[in-house]
């Protein structure tokens, strides 16, 4: 019996020490920035919003399919937590109009950035789920002036169950 309790206690301590993937347990309007970081770990990026909030970005990648943005008020209280990599957010990507700053705000840091020498453009890559929860790759091509030039949303056949070697 003592061994069982000891094993259970160690397991609970281990789980308590793990970072939360999506911030489960945090309460908007109550949880503090310190509690957010204690639960979710250090953010990959911090930005200051026009309203003075600090936005903490938690991409769960590079193979992950989610990026969470946690808004923290100037007083250090969490206001909201949002999953950014959604099909609805794709509507915000308008070639020739959307800026790289808007992409960073709406999608968070990319999983990978590559460069196209001939076109003198960068390609920001995100991995996410489509409307039917199938894996997709989002490629956002941006030019040197910081404007989105092309958006590709392609099904990722290599990440589908049994999809290795397809495509």
Located regions from the model:
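Bacterial N-terminal signal peptides that target proteins for export
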Residues: 1-8
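C-terminal motif of bacterial Sec signal peptides marking the signal peptidase cleavage site
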Residues: 15-17
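Residues within mature, well-folded domains
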Residues: 19-167
């Amino acid at each position: 019996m003592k061994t069982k309790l000891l094993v259970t206690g160690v397991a609970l301590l281990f789980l308590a020490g793990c970072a939360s993937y999506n911030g489960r347990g945090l309460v908007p309007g109550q949880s503090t920035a310190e509690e957010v970081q204690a639960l979710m770990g250090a953010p990959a990026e911090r930005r200051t919003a026009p309203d003075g909030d600090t936005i903490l970005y938690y991409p769960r990648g590079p193979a992950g399919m989610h990026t969470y943005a946690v808004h923290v008020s100037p007083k250090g209280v969490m206001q909201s937590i949002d999953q950014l990599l959604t099909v609805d957010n794709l509507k915000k990507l308008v070639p020739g109009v959307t800026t790289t700053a808007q992409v960073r705000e709406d999608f968070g840091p990319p999983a990978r950035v590559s460069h196209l020498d001939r076109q003198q453009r960068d390609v920001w890559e995100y991995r996410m789920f489509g409307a039917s929860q199938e894996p997709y790759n989002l490629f956002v091509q941006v030019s040197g002036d910081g404007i989105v030039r092309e958006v590709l949303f392609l099904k990722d056949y290599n990440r589908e169950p049994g999809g290795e070697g397809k495509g």
